[in-house]
From Swiss-Prot:
This is Small ribosomal subunit protein uS12. The lineage of its organism: Bacteria, Pseudomonadati, Pseudomonadota, Gammaproteobacteria, Pseudomonadales. Pfam families: Ribosom_S12_S23 (PF00164). Residues 101-123 are annotated as: Disordered. GO terms for molecular function: rRNA binding; structural constituent of ribosome; tRNA binding. Keywords: Methylation, Ribonucleoprotein, Ribosomal protein, RNA-binding, rRNA-binding, tRNA-binding. GO terms for cellular component: small ribosomal subunit. It comes from the Bacteria. It comes from Stutzerimonas stutzeri (strain A1501) (Pseudomonas stutzeri). Residues 113-123 have a biased composition (Basic residues). With S4 and S5 plays an important role in translational accuracy. Interacts with and stabilizes bases of the 16S rRNA that are involved in tRNA selection in the A site and with the mRNA backbone. Located at the interface of the 30S and 50S subunits, it traverses the body of the 30S subunit contacting proteins on the other side and probably holding the rRNA structure together. The combined cluster of proteins S8, S12 and S17 appears to hold together the shoulder and platform of the 30S subunit. The gene is rpsL. Part of the 30S ribosomal subunit. Contacts proteins S8 and S17. May interact with IF1 in the 30S initiation complex. PANTHER family: 30S RIBOSOMAL PROTEIN S12 FAMILY MEMBER. CDD domains: Ribosomal_S12 (cd03368).
Length: 123
């Protein structure tokens, strides 16, 4: 425990919390342009071809973003909306593309959990 004299000379340091999503700069989402759309393989116990795109954001950052859901329509110059949220088995992928906004289409024939994939209510 520090004495009052020590605290007067040098006050306590504030603990600075580090952001998990620095490229968003405290915004809920950011817009960007796809520079590359590709598939990549996950870490050790899992096996798949995960859909990922490289996105240049409006604030100048370039990040990798995961494209969730079955099938997508993204190409090289598509304009996408990025939200935070990492993919645990893809190292370096700390963002998700928002389905159903800007150039990203919603998932077709999606019946459950539709709001997460930008799918309209089936008639």
């Amino acid at each position: 425990m520090a004495t009052i004299n020590q605290l007067v000379r040098q006050p306590r340091k504030r603990v600075v919390e580090k952001s998990d999503v620095p490229a968003l700069q405290n915004c809920p989402q950011r817009r960007g342009v796809c520079t590359r759309v590709y598939t990549t393989t996950p870490k050790k116990p899992n096996s798949a071809l995960r859909k990922v795109c490289r996105v240049r954001l409006t604030n100048g950052y370039e990040v990798a973003s995961y494209i969730g859901g079955e099938g997508h329509n993204l190409q090289e110059h598509s304009v996408v909306l990025i939200r935070g949220g990492r993919v645990r088995d893809l190292p370096g992928v700390r963002y998700h593309t928002v389905r159903g906004s800007l150039d990203t289409s919603g998932v077709k024939d999606r019946k459950q959990g539709r709001s997460k994939y930008g799918a309209k209510r089936p008639k």
